[in-house]
Curated annotation (Swiss-Prot):
The keyword Membrane applies. GO terms for biological process: phospholipid biosynthetic process. It is found in: Cell inner membrane. It catalyses: an acyl phosphate + sn-glycerol 3-phosphate = a 1-acyl-sn-glycero-3-phosphate + phosphate. The keyword Transferase applies. It is a multi-pass membrane protein. The lineage of its organism: Bacteria, Pseudomonadati, Pseudomonadota, Alphaproteobacteria, Hyphomicrobiales. Keywords: Cell inner membrane, Cell membrane, Lipid biosynthesis, Lipid metabolism, Membrane, Phospholipid biosynthesis, Phospholipid metabolism, Transferase, Transmembrane, Transmembrane helix. This is Glycerol-3-phosphate acyltransferase. Its main location: membrane. Pathway: Lipid metabolism; phospholipid metabolism. Its EC number is 2.3.1.275. Catalyzes the transfer of an acyl group from acyl-phosphate (acyl-PO(4)) to glycerol-3-phosphate (G3P) to form lysophosphatidic acid (LPA). This enzyme utilizes acyl-phosphate as fatty acyl donor, but not acyl-CoA or acyl-ACP. It holds the Pfam family G3P_acyltransf.
Length: 203
C-alpha cells in the first residue's frame, strides 16, 4: 500500500512539474519559440530575453506554484500517518523537479529547475525558501548573474535544512542541488570564462 502511495506521489509530482509554462505563455503571447532564442531554455530567465518582463514574472510564479501544488496535493492524497504524508510530499517534490528538467512532452528537454526548486521548498519548509530567495537576491544584486545566484542559493539550502535538524529534507535538497548544478554545467563554464550573460542582457 505504501509503495503504491509513494509511486503515485512521484508520478503526480512529475506530471505537475512537466507542465512547460514558459513555452505555453510565450506561445499564447505570440513571441517566437522560446527554444530558439537565448539559451533555448523554457524557464523564466530565458523568457526575460524576449523583452516581456510580465511573461517572465508569470513563468517564474507558475513554475514555482506547480512545485508547491505537487507537494500539497501528494500530501493531501496520501493516507496513513504523518510520516507517510511527509514522505509522499518529498517524493512529489522530487517528481516535480524531474518533470521540469525532463518533461516527456518536450522530448525530455526542459528547464533548469530554479523556480520549481523554490516552489517545492515553499511546500515542504517555507523558511528555507525565504533563505533561498534572500541568498539569490543578494548574489544577483552584487554579481548580476542569475545562474550564479541560483547556484549559491541552492548550495546554502541543504546546509540550512541540516543545521536546523531537517535531515530528510536536507538529503532531498542535496540531491536536487546536485541536479541543479548539473543542469547549469554550461553556465558554470561560462562563469569561469567570464562569458556568462548577466541579468537583463540578451544573448
Amino acid at each position: 500500500m505504501m509503495i503504491g502511495i509513494y509511486i503515485a506521489a512521484l508520478v503526480i509530482g512529475y506530471l505537475f512539474g512537466s507542465i512547460p509554462f514558459g513555452l505555453i505563455l510565450t506561445k499564447i503571447a505570440g513571441t517566437q519559440d522560446l527554444r530558439s532564442i537565448g539559451s533555448g531554455n523554457i524557464g523564466a530567465t530565458n523568457v526575460l530575453r524576449t523583452g516581456r518582463k510580465g511573461l517572465a514574472a508569470a513563468t517564474l510564479l507558475l513554475d514555482a506554484l506547480k512545485g508547491t501544488a505537487a507537494v500539497i496535493v501528494a500530501a493531501y492524497l496520501a493516507s496513513g500517518t504523518d510520516a507517510i504524508a511527509a514522505n509522499a510530499a518529498m517524493l512529489a517534490a522530487l517528481g516535480a523537479f524531474l518533470g521540469h528538467l525532463f518533461p516527456v512532452w518536450l522530448k525530455f528537454k526542459g528547464g533548469k529547475g530554479v523556480a520549481v526548486y523554490i516552489g517545492v521548498l515553499i511546500g515542504l519548509f517555507w523558511p528555507a525558501a525565504v533563505v533561498f530567495c534572500i541568498m539569490w537576491l543578494a548574489t544577483a544584486f552584487t554579481s548580476r548573474y542569475s545562474s550564479l545566484s541560483a547556484l549559491v542559493a541552492s548550495f546554502v539550502t541543504p546546509i540550512f535544512l541540516w543545521w536546523f535538524g531537517h535531515d530528510s529534507l536536507a538529503s532531498l535538497f542535496a540531491v536536487l542541488t546536485l541536479l541543479l548544478f548539473w543542469m547549469h554545467r554550461e553556465n558554470i563554464k561560462r562563469l569561469q570564462a567570464g562569458t556568462e550573460s548577466k541579468i537583463g542582457q540578451k544573448k
